[in-house]
Every structure is written in C-alpha cells, then in structure tokens.
C-alpha cells in the first residue's frame, strides 16, 4: 500500500509512503530476488518486521523451547525494496524515522553461541521473556530496569556476488550489523553493489549493549519507518552513519561501572572484560551467571581503549549504573 503520489512529468516531486507487511520476508541475501516493493528516492517505507525465530519463541515460552530451536535460517528479514535509479557505484542513504516496539520480547543464552561459549557456566541454555508494554523501559528483575533504545540489528543491501548468502555475517553493504547506535534520527550510507540496491531489514532489538555478548539483545517484532535517498556517482567504502544525538542516549544517568582487560589479543581481552563484569554482577547484585551475561548483552558497552601500547591492548566493559533503581 502507498500514500501520496507523483505529479505529472515536469511537476514537483511528491514523496510517497509505502507499507510492507510481515509476509514480505526472505531468509538469504540474493541479488536475483524479485523486489517486494519498488520505490523512488525520497520515499518512505513502513516495515512490519517479525522476530527472528519464525514464531518458535512465544510470550509463554520457557527455557525448554531452546532445546528444539531451529536456527536454519537464522533471520527472517523484510524486503527487498528496490530503489529506482540505484546502480553499483552509487550510495543509498537510509534515515531511521521511527521504530515502534512490540508488547513483548526475549533474550536467550544458547550453548556455543555467545562470547563466553567455552565457559562451563554457559553449557546450558537460558531464556528471558521481557514485558515491553510498560512505556519506554522494561524490568529485568526487581531493582534493575532497561530503557529502550530500539534499532534494527539487520539493515543491508544485496551483495553483488551471485547466489544466496547467509544473513549472519555483516558485509560491506551492511547486513547483520547489530550496531546499537542505528536508532531513530540516525542516517546511514551504504555502498550499492547491485541494480536497485535491494534493501532489507529486520532482527529488531528494544535494547542492546555494544557487543551483544550473550548472542541476543532484547529481540522483538516492531514497526520500522525508514526514508530512502540516493547519492548518484558517490560511493562510500563501507557503511557509514551520522547520529543525531549522544552515543549513550538514555543510558547516561548515574555514572558507570567498568572492568578492563589487557593483553596482546583483543578477542581474549574482550572475553576477560566481560568475565570480570559477570563476576561483579554476581557478587554485587546477586545475579546468576546467565542473568549476568544477559544483562551485559542488553546494557554493557565494550570499548577498545587503546591499541598503541604494544605488546598489550586494553578492552573496557562499561555498565551504566542508572539501570539499578
């Protein structure tokens, strides 16, 4: 469905608003997919995006559902949307206009699929169901509240290479980015590799920290409104974006607690910084291992603090203390 319209040839441009429902989905990137919608530069699209498990997790689910969860395919994403006039060598800009969360969501820890997957504490699964219907935040446990900063975990274009491509790894043209700063007010710029660009989005999170260390944010369905434009003959090397506000947004209200880890391997430093944060949350806030890892995943920001003081680099994990009421 579309609203608005175009005037006759030579008249002023009148942008349109289009709607894609939950049935306009696919599971792989593919430059040969027929577009679900074709739009002009300047148009807006309202996407009804499903959650990623294809209905396997419901509001009534318990941790037992993870024992039979089918991850093939991992994502169902909305689109693709073709932009008229888009060609390889151009850049597509996408303005994030609005994201409206669903009434509930979930986070889970799945064995073998998290930052600390080799730790014995995480050899068993864990599922957290969130009530997202109480305004702009959700209770994790009594005394711990997570503010919403919703964004699409997946936003990207069809790769130029032929065939089907997994939605799991991020790419030059975007994809499974999980960049929590891609919130309302942000404008993205992505290089185009295939005619029409073929944009798709999904995997919406109500909140997530930088790192998504348990493997999920607060996963949910959502209504996502995006505005598209085209930069002809201009090509960015990879995704770039401009934010309208502060990096920390609603998190920065009461200071931060931080753990650090050093060493010559940034991956190991990242794991250790989160291990130390999990230990602190267990000790200071009486959380279980799984609860602590989920809280880190939805609220803790990982940062590379320095990469010049060889042979050791520093990774910092920062947790906003405003979560604790």
Annotate each PLM feature:
Residues 52-63, 99-109, 196-206, 305-308:
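Short, Lys/Arg- and Gly-enriched loop/turn segments at beta-strand edges
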Residues 98-184, 189:
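Intrinsically disordered, low-complexity linker/loop segments enriched in Gly/Pro
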Residues 152-176, 180-266, 278:
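Conserved mixed alpha/beta catalytic, RNA-binding, or beta-rich assembly cores of soluble enzyme
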Residues 20-30, 70-78, 165-173:
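Short, structured beta-strand/loop micro-motifs enriched in basic residues and often containing a Trp
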Residues 10, 15-69:
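N-terminal, Lys/Arg-enriched amphipathic/low-complexity engagement segments
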Residues 47, 91-94, 190:
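A generic structural signal for residues embedded in beta-strands
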